[in-house]
């Protein structure tokens, strides 16, 4: 009996930690990535402007069920924004480059702030390995690229690779099948 008491005491003592670790996943709710949610996410990635009625037809649920699922996916952070995908070359930003940056640890916040402030920085990743940061940059000219690189060079050692062409970009995310 003492062991059973310890088991339940420890479970309920750490239950808030378990809940925090798994976010909004509840032990009693449906799987957050069931077949309908995967279909819904796929449809929204193909066209985020679809109405709830169009989504309902595509996913095979009612409009209220779709609205509720979208609300839950937004609240849980699965859907965190709706964004247009821009053809950068058509608006005068034909050059895509990748910047690798190696810098001391104390420069982390300064680099993150700079990356957030520069409109030419499309993505910034803190990475493992020899480099500390990997950034995707979109610019109108090599002169603009050079100015961006110089801003980061003040924080550490840089290396730049220019993309000749982009073969795969903005590929839809496919949620894993977690149903048993």
Where is each model-derived feature located?
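A compositional/biophysical signature of low hydrophobicity enriched in polar/charged and small residues
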Residues: 2-180
